[in-house]
């Protein structure tokens, strides 16, 4: 698979497809609303992510460097997560790796005052959820 194809597939995959399973207390994403046009065409593009427990958050694209990386921020967090997280930033990066592509996903979570004390636990839960999502993404990216 080419870097270009991996970039495009990760950027445009429906979020419920890769985050559709609960991981302990982290609810699955059930839908994305408010997105105008194809996702990933413009820096500043936004969409609202809705989760099965009623939580929601606003995702804003902040970086588009096709085909090497794209980045986003998460804000306007509502629901249970609002107690722990005030915002987050993330970056997906793509680079050739032998005959394939290395896909990396990094993030930085800004905790609330209350959430600061819970971050070690939240970090373990989030890492598990992220690993689960990467497994789902791996299935999609298989040639």
What are these regions (language model features)?
Residues 49, 59, 69-74, 103-105:
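Short hydrophobic/aromatic-rich beta-strand segments that constitute the beta-sheet cores
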